[in-house]
């Protein structure tokens, strides 16, 4: 939860320092931060980055955390892990408070994979959808 507040603070600072904040860029940075949590093994923060994370039962939240850990273990077996995440592009619809962020995973076996991360903005914070 503290990390979500940190992200909200970053968004607020960006909003105060510039009139025309690019919400697509904010969504992209938030998506990258959530995936950085995943790479760092902070699975709870990754799960908490999903929209409406606070309205799910604790048992389901624990299952999501376990799934994130299993996913990272699978990537280690198949690709020698995810070594880095890069933002490639973002397409934002500010009227609908939504964005699609395109990220590239750089794997330990020198392969790359581009993924699309749907994001949604709620009360000034961008969440994974």
Question: Which positions does each model-derived feature cover?
Answer:
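Sec-dependent bacterial lipoprotein signal peptides
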Residues: 1-18
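Solvent-exposed, well-ordered amphipathic alpha-helical segments
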Residues: 2-3, 33-37, 96-99, 117
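Residue-level detector of secondary-structure boundary/capping sites
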Residues: 7, 22-25, 110
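Short, low-complexity N-terminal intrinsically disordered segments enriched in polar/charged residues
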Residues: 16-40
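Short solvent-exposed beta->alpha transition segments
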Residues: 28-29, 33, 44-94
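Loop/turn elements at helix/coil->beta-strand transitions in domains of secreted/extracellular proteins
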Residues: 41-43, 124
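Exposed beta-sheet edge and beta->alpha loop/turn motif
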Residues: 86-129
């Amino acid at each position: 939860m503290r990390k979500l507040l940190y992200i909200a603070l970053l968004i607020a600072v960006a909003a105060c320092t510039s009139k025309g904040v690019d919400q697509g860029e904010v969504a992209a940075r938030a998506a990258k931060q959530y995936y950085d949590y995943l790479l760092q093994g902070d699975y709870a923060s990754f799960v908490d980055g999903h929209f409406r994370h606070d309205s799910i039962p604790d048992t389901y939240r624990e299952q999501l955390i376990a799934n994130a850990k299993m996913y990272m273990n699978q990537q280690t077996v198949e690709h020698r892990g995810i070594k880095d995440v890069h933002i490639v592009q973002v397409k934002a619809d500010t009227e609908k408070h939504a964005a699609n962020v395109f990220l590239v995973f750089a794997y330990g076996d020198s392969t790359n994979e581009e993924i699309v991360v749907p994001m949604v903005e709620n009360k000034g914070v961008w969440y994974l959808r």
